[in-house]
């Protein structure tokens, strides 16, 4: 079974389906603080005191001796020394706040207070605390496994995710470090820690955890972000880290770990603080992708496991419309639009023209700060009439941050609108919004730095896709030439008179709502 991650009320939840008694489908799902079970159309919160979650309890009393407050609980809790507990509701406000506690026994803990508040405390007092679980939930041989931030792996009762026992745990303790994520490969439970990875298998112990460690599989490769862990084709991917190097991406097949990120990808990862990450695996048109979102740097990376290559996935978000006027000559429309701010080769949607030939999505050529042009049917009346607007787009990280396969369809969830949409090679827009395709080559010099004259560039590929734009850079990507249109559907998809260069990189841009499949650029 594969775990699914979703976000509810701002909290990420890990979900695991299972077959309960009488062939009833059940779902166990948990956040870092709470857990629930859905079975036979009944939703039950996991309230077992031995489950490593958070709870809010009304203390029996809070007393003070000197600067030490002692809390008496009505029943045993699994809270730990060194964890933080929130006290609220005391009439004597010195007792209230977030405090690091020292547990003296299962029903008592102490914390330090300032001042000399009256003892015992009065008011409607609550104490909120517990253990925080890391991302991931594992199902193995009828048990559910979760791990807390101290790298303690807990298991449920057999075939019952609502029941947990105080003795049913095992600690990943070969190497120091906190727990970061828990996952599974084949029949092994994987405890991913800050600087290491430990493996466990089910040996059927009569008491305590059914797991025992696989000592020979231990590695000194840890996990940098629990939310980066994703499963795809019986392979686990994650952002890794080790004491000798920064973040990278590894994959695990069985017990074997392999680096899949390149130095370029590692440099991108190093610019992120990894505080807001999402990841999932998805298969499209025979290709398997590990999708990794880094929200803090506005980047989504996608590793194509089939070809072994990396790409960047983006989403376009519509800007506010701007007023413009339009005219055309010879099949080229010119838009006058004050301070439009659109980049050369960008996607722009024209609306409101009475002459419908102007309306729709266009890939523009920036003429100046106040004008741009695009291709249009040469029969369009000029100038255009109507209340005409131009809408550009901001490009950012891929906004579809969760994935699920359901009813034979691949569905992704838009993280801001909540739209659940199908992702398919048959669609060429993101739910009506353009998809920006950008292909960039490395720097080409023909193994020598003499000036080279380039008479033409031909785009080799299927004769489909409509218009695209070509441009190039002769100064190590610092600046680019103006975009030049090329008709990908033409038998001779090419541009001529391409100047001279010593070293040049090429870039092709495409935004049309049409299929495109390209192979290479032919320089001549």
Task: Give, region by region, the residue ranges found by the protein language model.
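N-terminal assembly/attachment segments of tailed bacteriophage virion structural proteins
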Residues: 1-28, 32-37, 41, 48, ...
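Beta-sheet repeat architectures centered on beta-propellers
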Residues: 1-27, 220-236, 241-319, 387, ...
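Beta-propeller and closely related beta-pinwheel folds
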Residues: 2-14, 42-54, 130-143, 147-278, ...
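Recurrent small/Gly-Pro-centered beta-turn motifs in extracellular repeat architectures
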Residues: 29-31, 113, 148, 193, ...
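Short beta-strand segments and strand-loop junctions that repeat across beta-rich extracellular domains
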Residues: 33-38, 151-163, 197, 202, ...
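Predominantly extracellular/luminal cell-surface or secreted proteins
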Residues: 38, 86-90, 112-114, 154-159, ...
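Small/polar beta-strand repeat architecture
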Residues: 48-132, 319-394
């Amino acid at each position: 079974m594969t775990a699914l991650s979703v976000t509810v009320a701002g909290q990420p939840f890990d979900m695991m389906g299972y077959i309960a008694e009488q062939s009833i489908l059940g779902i166990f799902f948990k956040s870092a603080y709470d857990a629930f079970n859905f079975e036979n159309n009944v939703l039950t919160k996991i309230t077992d005191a031995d489950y490593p979650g958070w709870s809010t309890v009304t203390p029996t009393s809070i007393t003070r001796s000197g600067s030490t407050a002692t809390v008496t609980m009505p029943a045993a809790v699994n809270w730990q020394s060194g964890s933080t507990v929130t006290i609220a509701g005391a009439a004597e406000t010195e007792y209230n706040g977030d405090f690091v506690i020292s547990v003296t026994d299962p029903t008592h803990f102490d914390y330090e207070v300032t001042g000399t508040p009256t003892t015992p405390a009065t008011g409607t007092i609550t104490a909120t605390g517990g253990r925080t679980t890391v991302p991931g939930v594992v199902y193995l041989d009828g048990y559910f496994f979760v791990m807390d931030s101290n790298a303690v792996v807990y298991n449920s009762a057999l075939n019952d995710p609502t029941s947990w026992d105080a003795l049913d745990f095992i600690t990943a303790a070969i190497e120091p470090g906190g727990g970061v994520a828990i996952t599974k490969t084949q029949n092994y439970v994987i405890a991913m820690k800050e600087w290491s990875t430990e493996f466990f298998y089910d040996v059927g112990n009569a008491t305590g955890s059914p797991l025992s460690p696989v000592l020979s599989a231990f590695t000194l490769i840890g996990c940098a972000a629990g939310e980066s862990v994703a499963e795809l084709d019986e392979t686990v991917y994650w952002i890794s880290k080790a004491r000798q190097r920064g973040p990278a991406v590894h994959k695990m097949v069985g017990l074997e770990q392999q680096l899949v990120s390149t130095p370029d990808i590692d440099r991108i990862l190093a610019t992120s603080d990894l505080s807001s990450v999402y990841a999932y695996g998805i298969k499209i048109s025979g290709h398997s992708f590990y999708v990794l979102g880094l929200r803090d740097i506005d980047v989504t990376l996608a590793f194509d496991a089939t070809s072994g290559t990396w790409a960047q996935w983006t989403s376009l978000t519509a800007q506010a419309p701007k007023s413009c006027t339009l005219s055309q000559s010879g099949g080229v429309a010119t838009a006058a639009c004050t301070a439009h701010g659109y980049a050369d080769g960008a996607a722009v949607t024209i609306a409101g023209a009475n002459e419908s030939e102007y309306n729709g999505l266009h890939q523009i050529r920036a003429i100046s700060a106040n004008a741009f042009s695009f291709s249009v049917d040469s029969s369009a009346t000029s100038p255009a009439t109507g209340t005409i607007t131009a809408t550009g787009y901001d490009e950012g990280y891929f906004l579809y941050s969760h994935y699920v396969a359901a009813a034979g369809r691949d569905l992704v969830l838009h993280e801001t609108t909540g739209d659940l949409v199908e992702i398919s090679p048959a669609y060429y827009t993101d739910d009506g919004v353009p998809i920006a395709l950008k292909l960039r080559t490395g720097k080409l010099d023909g193994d020598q730095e003499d000036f080279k004259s380039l008479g033409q560039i031909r785009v080799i590929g299927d004769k489909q896709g409509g218009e695209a734009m070509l441009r190039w850079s002769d100064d190590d990507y610092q600046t680019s030439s103006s975009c030049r249109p090329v008709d990908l559907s033409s038998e001779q998809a090419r541009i001529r008179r391409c100047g001279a260069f010593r070293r040049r990189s090429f870039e092709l841009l495409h935004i049309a709502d049409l299929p495109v499949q390209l192979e290479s650029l032919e320089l001549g």
